[in-house]
Amino acid sequence: MNSKIEEMRITLIETAQKYGMNSKETIQCSQELDILLNTRIKEEMIFGRYLENSRM
C-alpha cells in the first residue's frame, strides 16, 4: 500500500506541475490519493483494534 501511495503522490506533483493546481487532472489525482490514504487509515484502525482485542 505504501508504494501505491508514494507513486500516486509523485503523480499528483507531476500532474500539478504540468496542468496547474486547479486542473481537473490534478483534482482527480488528488482524490485518488485521498482514497488510498483513507483506505490505509481504515486498515490501520481495524488492525489496531484487532491487536487490542487479541490481547484481552
UniProtKB/Swiss-Prot annotation:
Keywords attached to this entry: Hydrolase, Sporulation
Q: Which GO terms describe its molecular function?
A: hydrolase activity; protein dimerization activity
In its keyword annotation, does this UniProt entry include ATP-binding? no
* Induction remark: During exponential phase and in conditions antithetical to sporulation.
Q: What is its EC number?
A: 3.1.3.-
Q: Name a single GO biological process.
A: sporulation resulting in formation of a cellular spore
Gene3D superfamilies per the record? Helix-loop-helix DNA-binding domain (4.10.280.10)
Q: Which domain of life is it from?
A: Bacteria
Task performed by this protein: Aspartyl-phosphate phosphatase which specifically dephosphorylates the sporulation transcription factor Spo0A-P and negatively regulates the sporulation initiation pathway in order to control the proper timing of sporulation.
What is the similarity comment for this entry? Belongs to the spo0E family.
Enumerate the PANTHER family for this protein.
ASPARTYL-PHOSPHATE PHOSPHATASE YISI (PTHR41263:SF1)
Name listed for the protein in its UniProt record: Aspartyl-phosphate phosphatase YisI
Organism from which the protein derives? Bacillus subtilis (strain 168)
